[in-house]
Amino acid sequence: KVAILLEQRKRMEQEFDAMDRVSYVPSHGNYLLTRFDDHLATDLYEALVKKGIFVRPFSDPRLTHDLRISVGTPDQTTRVLEAISDLI
């Protein structure tokens, strides 16, 4: 299971590297702290929740452009990456 999570985290990093308006803090955990340009994080959070994809927003003013996105199964990774790609 750890190998799958590591593989999916790497996949998410590669996909985010290819996206405009998205960056992330490299992680050794099972999530990525993902930063979006402008106020995109709030809009993305709301749109992802409507799709049944739950990510964690932050109320701290320094993190208002950020979402914590957990690394999951290959299917979950595909779902979240496709949703974000469609929304940005």
Question: What are the functions of these language-model segments?
Answer:
Residues 5-6, 16-51, 67:
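Conserved PLP-binding catalytic core of the aspartate aminotransferase-like
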Residues 1-3, 88:
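N-terminal/domain-start segments enriched in small and hydrophobic, helix-friendly residues
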